Amino acid sequence: MTNAVTVKNITFQEGETLICVPLIGKTLDEILGNAHGLVDAGADIIEWRVDHFTQVRDMTQVMAALAEIRGALKALPLLFTFRSKKEGGETEISDEAYFALNREAARSGLVDVIDIELFNDEAQIHALVDDAHAAGVKVIMSNHDFHKTPAQEDIIYRLRRMQDLGADLPKIAVMPQSPQDVLTLLAATLTMKEKYATRPLITMSMGKSGGVSRVTGRLFGSAMTFGTVGQASAPGQIAIAKLREVMDILS
């Protein structure tokens, strides 16, 4: 049995799958326009993909934007994510800037969760996790493979490593090249949940063929899925209204 993780007014727990919707925009005006459209969309949590923001290298501008986003989203929980170029993001920044950006967001009092990518310097990961937790911010630790689906054992190893590094919510997203790859991701998720997980997991198989993994989290053990209102942030994301309908049918 995994321990539940509560973020504001939502709880990540076994047998439940929450819906996260990405907030994307290049300019502050575009971001805020999109943010207002998300408030009543039915999402459980919003992910600001700050790597799409053209001024992401200017910490002052990022924090100013974050304050306005926080106001626009009202009580909705907010996940702050800079997705690196190597894992499918829009912008490349230095490792130093990556950790500084996430640390500033965690300490700002404006975000509820930050995303830290697994494949980084472990000492820096440990320090950032500690800083986030000290600020009362939860940590999603993530890995994204946009080219393939690793072996089941490798998926499980990465999720367990995230747990060891202090993640509140380990996350992995992989790209299937065959139906068997989708089954590999689902089997890895179920095995992780039943044998090794001490906290909720987030897993998905991307692209159209991986869509089944986005709606069966309650069965296999993924505690969050990603839906869209407008622009998707990853291949295979489903419009939130359709996503919730299918999830309700399957539950």
From Swiss-Prot:
Organism whose genome encodes this protein: Klebsiella pneumoniae (strain 342)
EC assignment: 4.2.1.10
Pfam families (alphabetical): DHquinase_I (PF01487)
CDD domains referenced in this protein's UniProt entry, alphabetically: DHQase_I
GO biological process, one term: chorismate biosynthetic process
Cited SUPFAM superfamilies: Aldolase (SSF51569)
GO MF, one example: 3-dehydroquinate dehydratase activity
NCBIfam families found in the cross-reference section: aroD
Superkingdom assignment: Bacteria
Pathway(s) per entry: Metabolic intermediate biosynthesis; chorismate biosynthesis; chorismate from D-erythrose 4-phosphate and phosphoenolpyruvate: step 3/7
Active site: H144 (proton donor/acceptor), K171 (schiff-base intermediate with substrate)
Function of the protein: Involved in the third step of the chorismate pathway, which leads to the biosynthesis of aromatic amino acids. Catalyzes the cis-dehydration of 3-dehydroquinate (DHQ) and introduces the first double bond of the aromatic ring to yield 3-dehydroshikimate.
Protein name: 3-dehydroquinate dehydratase
UniProt keyword terms in alphabetical order: Amino-acid biosynthesis, Aromatic amino acid biosynthesis, Lyase, Schiff base
Assembly and oligomerization: Homodimer.
InterPro entries for the chain: 3-dehydroquinate_DH_AS, Aldolase_TIM, DHquinase_I, Type-I_3-dehydroquinase
Top EC class of this enzyme: lyase
PANTHER family for this protein: 3-DEHYDROQUINATE DEHYDRATASE
Family: Belongs to the type-I 3-dehydroquinase family.
Catalytic reactions on record: 3-dehydroquinate = 3-dehydroshikimate + H2O
Entry binding sites for 3-dehydroquinate: E47, W48, R49, R83, R214, S233, Q237
